[in-house]
């Protein structure tokens, strides 16, 4: 791959990530709040009568709409874009690094394995995920802390630089890498996503090629091609996210301020013990509602920018 091709993939990946992040930021804030242990801020208690006549309070987890309403009422609409700054700072380099690493790995591995085989896509996605996570984890930690900073209207909101200073004073440099083990576990989601995406993309390409051969038409990129890419991205991301979602909850807990959570497996075990298995999927609906259009927008933007820059 030439230096120009690498720069094209870097730029296209950055554009795709940025557009997706801006359009889906409110859903990202709601999802992060639902994943957090501080979700009790928005939890109501339901009083139940027992057989003996006594009453007990049962904690009921809030739904996405309940959480959204509570944020709007207590903190105002601007809080739905909390963490957007670090998100934009992080998403462009993260996606750029990811897509450039993915494309480079895929090109090199095509010479080792069968070209564009499942092994190539899996290994490329894993290496790209590892590279992007290691490089950008501090930015995502700050973004998560800002999104969890629930302050009512009128109170001064914590800024990104204040958050950076606070993390460094409390935990030192190591504090910026909290939750990275859960992010590494999440590479499985990336691998599943890209394997399914590339498989669907290949099938769509084969169908189009066969159709072109029958009609003797030249293969030209059309608007319908980008719609198909968006559908392929949405389908693959839905499957991957549903399978690997618990790592998202664990990662959010590890990134919380003053947390009792210390490591990936300790956090996973503690969440199950204290809140049950269902809590590992808290916020999944919101995550899917956000992630599906976000991924579709990101992948379609990426493919479009690569196509335009390559002529």
From Swiss-Prot:
Keywords: Membrane, Mitochondrion, Mitochondrion inner membrane, Repeat, Transmembrane, Transmembrane helix, Transport
Entry's Gene Ontology molecular function annotations: pyrimidine nucleotide transmembrane transporter activity
Gene3D superfamilies given in the database record: Mitochondrial carrier domain
Any one GO BP annotation for this protein: mitochondrion organization
Keyword Transport: yes
Superkingdom: Eukaryota
Cited InterPro entries: Mit_carrier, Mitochondrial_sb/sol_carrier, Mt_carrier_dom_sf, SLC25A33/36-like
Segments annotated as Solcar repeats: 4-108, 116-203, 224-308
Reaction(s) this enzyme catalyzes, per UniProt: UTP(in) + CTP(out) = UTP(out) + CTP(in); CTP(out) + UDP(in) = CTP(in) + UDP(out); UMP(in) + CTP(out) = UMP(out) + CTP(in); dUTP(in) + CTP(out) = dUTP(out) + CTP(in)
Pfam families to which the protein is assigned, alphabetical: Mito_carr (PF00153)
Family as reported in the entry's similarity comment: Belongs to the mitochondrial carrier (TC 2.A.29) family.
Function in brief: Mitochondrial transporter that imports/exports pyrimidine nucleotides into and from mitochondria. Selectively transports cytosine, guanosine, inosine and uridine (deoxy)nucleoside mono-, di-, and triphosphates by antiport mechanism. Catalyzes uniport at much lower rate. May import (deoxy)nucleoside triphosphates in exchange for intramitochondrial (deoxy)nucleoside mono- and diphosphates, thus providing precursors necessary for de novo synthesis of mitochondrial DNA and RNA while exporting products of their catabolism.
This protein's name: Solute carrier family 25 member 36
Organism field: Mus musculus
